[in-house]
Amino acid sequence: MPKTMHFLFRFIVFFYLWGLFTAQRQKKEERTEEVKIEVLHRPENCSKTSKKGDLLNAHYDGYLAKDGSKFYCSRTQNEGHPKWFVLGVGQVIKGLDIAMTDMCPGEKRKVVIPPSFAYGKEGYAEGKIPPDATLIFEIELYAVTKGPRSTETFKQIDMDSDRQLSKAEINLYLQREFEKDEKPRDKSYQDAVLEDIFKKNDHDGDGFISPKEYNVYQHDEL
């Protein structure tokens, strides 16, 4: 084999093996990275835990692991009302979807989320969350209800069977769900939740949520 061809062959083999080594190392790193969960408080009575597709109501604070600086606080948004979101459908970062699975209403957790389950190499919010940042969240879960996106639930809310959800119908549904939760909430809280639902889902602004609008999951920033 001519020297030039021999060198080229060795060159190709080297980079092929290097590529395999790099890919295996990346897979190993992905396997070793995981969301770490510390349960700070768990109620003694827990008849229902959160699962994919459930509608959750929670507050959470976010910190950068490297220096402990706070970058997010849900209590500073929506007049301090807890956030509503559906678990496991990408409305929050993947790490939070994992961290909030199998939680009881009233449970508190502290979780550590590696970059691969957060914002990765890109970072977020114009440098507020830098690239490759490990994040810490302190979470308090208030309520777990059946996810609102199933056909069955749509039919339950749609009392007059006109295939659209009015504010009155959704308001009644929320009232029933809050009563099941057995935690006192004033009318202003329920009104705020109702307003938020229509703000995120009534895309054509007609005052109703259609089946199409109902089945569109919104992606929140955090």
Swiss-Prot record:
The keyword Transferase does not apply. PROSITE patterns: EF_HAND_1, EF_HAND_2, ER_TARGET, FKBP_PPIASE. InterPro entries: EF-hand-dom_pair, EF_Hand_1_Ca_BS, EF_hand_dom, PPIase_dom_sf, PPIase_FKBP, PPIase_FKBP_dom. Residues 53-145 form the PPIase FKBP-type domain. Its EC number is 5.2.1.8. PPIases accelerate the folding of proteins during protein synthesis. One of its GO terms (cellular component) is endoplasmic reticulum lumen. Binds calcium. Residues 145-180, 189-222 form the EF-hand domain. Ca(2+) 1 binds at residues 158, 160, 162, 164, 169. This is Peptidyl-prolyl cis-trans isomerase FKBP7. The keyword Secreted does not apply. Ca(2+) 2 binds at residues 202, 204, 206, 213. One of its GO terms (molecular function) is peptidyl-prolyl cis-trans isomerase activity. It comes from the Eukaryota. It catalyses: [protein]-peptidylproline (omega=180) = [protein]-peptidylproline (omega=0). Residues 1-23 form the signal peptide. It comes from Pongo abelii (Sumatran orangutan). A motif (Prevents secretion from ER) lies at residues 219-222. Keywords: Calcium, Endoplasmic reticulum, Glycoprotein, Isomerase, Metal-binding, Repeat, Rotamase, Signal. It is found in: Endoplasmic reticulum lumen.
